[in-house]
A protein has these predicted regions:
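Conserved pre-ATP/AMP-binding loop-to-beta segment of ANL
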Residues: 14, 30, 156-176, 181, ...
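Conserved AMP-binding A3 loop
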Residues: 42-44, 170-197
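Conserved AMP-binding/adenylate-forming core of the ANL superfamily
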Residues: 9-13, 22, 30-61, 65-74, ...
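Conserved ATP/PPi-binding loop(s) of AMP-dependent carboxylate-activating enzymes
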Residues: 339-343, 354-386, 422-424
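Gly/Ser/Thr-rich phosphate-binding loop
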Residues: 255-263, 272-333, 345
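ANL superfamily adenylate-forming
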Residues: 120-166, 176, 181, 274
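Conserved AMP-binding/adenylation subdomain of ANL enzymes
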Residues: 193-211, 221-260, 274
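AMP-binding/adenylate-forming catalytic core of the ANL superfamily
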Residues: 77, 98, 115-117, 370, ...
Length: 517
């Protein structure tokens, strides 16, 4: 699909991410590429290690096959990921917290030829690979696994030939699976590479002068896009946190003079209430990026007031390669995910048929097209046909755009509630709750109601020391929402149900709220 678009209007588009890394090593070989704890690699060393491991994978027959990566954050995971690409194999990044049941579905569906894993998951992965008869399993990192920086001094190493083609599959990224079994999204090198350049056009970086902090897990599509690929494209330094700890993040931000901070909304919310936040020096930070879940407007305002740095919010999904829109620097609009990226088209269409195109200010489903859109789902022809219709990706997200072309996401189509015949988008209720001074986190959902069909309920986490009652919060909603949108019940809880990547788990949320009685 990328080939039918005029990509000459974009900053340099590499044929594949392997070419991108090779270019970075050629231009900035002595610059530090990766830092994780006391380990680091220059760009020249990075490429050597990728070449060394890629040659090993190629020798195992990985070309054209799927290679699963079940690893936590470390210096080894970027090397392994690029090595899979360099071996002309398709990378399958998998959440390392998945159970054996969840892993089985993905490994079987992907027909994994090689599984790369670390010692933290060895007890689960090794017997599973044996039972599934996976041809090859390689343990990396830690005290008992292979160290993938072993090739860093071997200047004679070269990438295996031939390199992958732009039309080859680069990744098979499985979607979260909060409803049903995860679906594998096929993304080609062309689709991946053009989206990197689309993001660069919208969010320009400074070549050889960026330091990006990666606290997100590198199996997640947002982390791969906004950390791993962003750093390699601009030849910046990627500082990797093995796991997220707010005090460590704040320390690294100052010590490493971080310039770019991609994170999910829960991180920004948590940092604002951390005891060390007010004393942290944010002078090096140029931009923070938010994605993967809605960012409360109140969080955006508080962050910018406290740090002097904007949080730029974008919109996308795994199927979209993954980014479709982003707020531009200097053009912040609270609550908006910005205008489209170059070479990207978004339309709002009616929810019922998806065929009637709506205008500015009208709410409907977002559909998208562009050179970054997925090829389809693996082994899911029916779901592919439902998602890709008439050249458009139907995102399942509800939103609108204004006269300036700025998009606002209202909710997921499947999360919309119908209360007495009226459409209610839980995210709007969330935003009103977040505007209360005592609220730290909030999540609303529709639940079955014998009279109205559905009614709204919500969980709320209060700030430390806050004293608001559920009745106070309902009164606040009554002052700011139409009557049918006001939660019938609000429950004060210690934490919201979340998925393993930190998003509010909407499926569990609905189930728990419905069970409250």
């Amino acid at each position: 699909m990328a080939g039918s678009w005029d990509t000459s209007v974009l900053p340099r588009v590499h044929p594949t991410v392997v070419h991108m890394l090779a270019d970075a090593a050629a231009r900035s070989g002595g610059a530090t590429a990766l830092v994780c704890g006391d380990r680091q690699l220059s760009y020249a060393q990075y490429l050597r290690c990728v070449a060394g491991f890629a040659r090993e994978l190629a020798g195992l027959g990985a070309r054209g096959a799927r290679v699963a990566l079940i690893c936590g954050n470390s210096l080894d995971i970027p090397v392994a990921t690029f090595a899979v690409h360099a071996a002309a194999a398709q990378a399958v990044p998998i959440n390392p917290t998945y159970t054996a049941r969840e892993l089985t579905h993905i490994l079987v569906d992907a027909e994994a030829h090689v599984v790369i894993y670390d010692e933290d998951v060895a007890a689960t992965v090794e017997p599973l690979c044996a039972s599934l008869k996976v041809p090859h399993a390689i343990r990396i990192g830690g005290k008992t696994g292979r160290s993938l920086d072993a090739w860093k001094q071997d200047a004679a190493l070269a990438l295996p030939e031939p390199l992958p083609a732009a039309s080859d599959f680069a990744t098979l990224q499985y979607t979260g699976g909060t409803t049903g079994l995860p679906k594998g999204v096929n993304i080609t090198h062309a689709q991946m590479s053009v989206n990197i350049s689309q993001r660069e056009a919208a969010l320009p970086t400074r070549a050889d002068d960026e330091r990006i902090l990666c606290m997100m897990p590198l199996f997640h599509v947002f982390a791969v896009a906004m950390c791993l690929h962003l750093a390699a494209y601009c030849r910046g330094r990627l500082v990797i946190m093995p796991r997220y700890k707010p005090d460590v993040l704040l320390d690294l931000l100052v010590r490493e003079r971080i310039t770019r901070l991609p994170a999910g909304p829960t991180v920004f919310i948590g940092l604002l209430s951390h005891e060390a936040f007010a004393a942290t020096d944010f002078s090096s930070l140029r931009t923070a990026y938010s994605g993967s879940a809605p960012l409360p407007e109140e969080t955006l305002r508080k962050w910018q007031a406290a740090t002097g740095t904007p949080i730029l919010e974008g919109f996308g999904q795994t199927e979209a390669g993954p980014v479709l829109t982003y707020v531009r620097e200097g053009a912040l609009k609270a609550g908006s995910v910005g205008p489209v990226l170059p070479l990207t088209e978004l339309q709002i269409v009616d929810v019922e048929t998806g065929t009637k195109v709506l205008g500015a200010g009208e709410i409907g489903e977002i559909r998208a097209r562009g050179p970054q859109i997925m090829s389809g789902y693996r082994n899911r022809p029916k779901e592919t046909a439902e998602a890709l219709r008439d050249g458009w990706l139907y995102t399942g997200d509800i939103g609108e755009f204004d006269e300036q072309g700025y998009f606002t996401i209202r909710d997921r189509k499947k999360d919309m509630a119908i209360v007495g015949g009226y459409n209610v988008y839980p995210r709007e209720v969330d935003e009103v709750l977040y505007s209360h001074a005592d609220v730290k986190e909030a999540a609303a959902s529709g639940v079955p109601d014998s009279y109205y069909g559905e009614s709204i309920r919500a969980y709320v986490v209060l700030k430390e020391g806050a004293r608001a009652s559920a009745e106070d919060l309902i009164a606040h909603c009554r002052s700011n929402l139409a009557r049918y949108k006001v939660p019938s019940k609000i429950y004060l809880v210690a934490e919201l149900p979340r998925t393993t990547v930190g998003k509010v788990d909407r499926k569990t949320l609905r189930q728990k709220l419905a069970a409250e009685g």
